[in-house]
């Protein structure tokens, strides 16, 4: 069985945004030599996410609005107990929990085996600093 690991470094200038990382994931799969297997992609930070959806700007705007309604940004310690530690990103932890940590995509004939419109996205909820994404490809 083959195993290939690579990392992306994300540095999103906005506090919350979504970045299509499908091309980088496809490149990692191609470089792995795996023809049949699995590709794990996960955010390696507790205020970031990796998820699969459509690359449609209106949908991304809807997500941002919806997430902000669920867990509004509020740096004060009143809303989020986490902010009582001196942090100001309690909302970002909640947003990550909703959007998830990772995705696993089948690799078939050396390519990501997506359904229609599916793309891999990095979700940033407390941006303006470097964070890593792990890409792990395993298989034959």
Predicted ranges, named:
Residues 1-140:
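Active-site histidine-anchored catalytic micro-motif
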């Amino acid at each position: 069985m083959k195993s290939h690991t690579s990392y992306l470094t994300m540095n999103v200038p906005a506090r919350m945004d979504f970045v299509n990382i499908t091309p980088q994931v496809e490149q990692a799969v191609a470089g792995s030599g795996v023809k049949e297997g699995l590709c794990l992609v996960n955010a390696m930070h507790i205020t970031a996410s990796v998820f699969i959806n459509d690359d449609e700007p209106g949908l991304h705007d809807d997500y941002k609005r919806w997430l902000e309604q669920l867990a509004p940004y509020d740096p004060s310690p009143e809303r989020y107990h986490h902010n009582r530690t001196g942090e100001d990103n309690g909302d970002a932890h909640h947003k990550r929990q909703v959007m998830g940590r990772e995705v696993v995509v089948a690799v078939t004939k050396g390519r990501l085996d997506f359904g229609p419109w599916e793309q891999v996205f990095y979700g940033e909820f407390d941006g303006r600093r470097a964070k890593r994404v792990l890409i792990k490809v395993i298989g034959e």
